[in-house]
Amino acid sequence: YWKAVGSSKLDAMTRSLEAEDVDGVIVFVRTKTLTVELAEKLEARGHRASPINGDMSQQLRERTIEHLKSNKIDIVVATDVAARGIDVARVSHVINYDIPYDTEAYVHRIGRTGRAGRAGNAILFVAPRERNMLRSIEKATRQTITPMDLPSREQVKERRIDQFKASIDKALEQSDLSIYSDLVEEVVTEREVAPDKAANA
């Protein structure tokens, strides 16, 4: 769990998402309004996210779950009621953005990850006034929920660099790069710039 003090929960969550190996993610919040607001904020930060709540039609909820299954989105922001019945094997993380009102809801939430024999991770944000609920959850699950440190900005930066290198390696393996070579040569000739500068751009 992370002590939700100081930096915002949104910043804490995005840093965790960027520093860890994540696949599909379900983020649990308490209100329908927050599902929409948080999904929009995650989208603005470059994540593929969609809300799912009780105000949405059954058809739209099912389509959102299908998008998560088929890798069209990576994050679903959900209320407890709307998340019932979600069974997606690729969910690697459940993030309890808002602590649940009762221990049973917590057990249902974390049961959404680690499906089909895969490893799963659950992260819980706990404000100081919510420590009693944390203790109740530990008692009900008979597990100690350990505190976590947020990834440093340096760790996030290193992770981004590694991901960028991996995307370059993938492009080198799969693509016909001759079109880009021709384009760089054209830019060098037309703009009279150094080849390495054109390639870096």
Regions found by a protein language model. Give the residues of each.
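Conserved interdomain hinge at the start of the Helicase C-terminal
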Residues: 1-43, 182-186
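Conserved RecA-like helicase motor core of SF1/SF2 enzymes
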Residues: 40-143
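Arginine-glycine-biased low-complexity disordered regions
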Residues: 118-201
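Proline- and acidic/polar-enriched loop/turn elements at helix boundaries
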Residues: 29, 54, 80, 106, ...
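Positions that flank functional sites
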Residues: 32, 57, 83, 152-153
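Short phosphate-engaging motifs
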Residues: 9, 34, 102, 130-133, ...
